[in-house]
């Protein structure tokens, strides 16, 4: 969360409070969903722009007693429709609920190819 939050702040997509807002959300309800992925996000939409920071790990980490290798840090601005998050969440979950698709995304180390795979599914 720290690494990805820093990237969003560096690029001007979120302010310095973003990381603490995400960590506060994790305290309330961890965002590791099983099948090797997590989708952290703040409780409120506090981003400056709508962005997703993605991190694929070579080795899994423990995240609230679940193994995680693929992280989607969601950054939505306050003007975003709630349905935007719901649609994004549903899309990511539908892809990652399929172990073969999840593994293909985890293994892809080229960002352009990763995006192509993501949108292909």
Show the residue positions of the predicted features.
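Cytosolic covalent-transfer regions centered on His/Cys nucleophiles
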Residues: 1-121
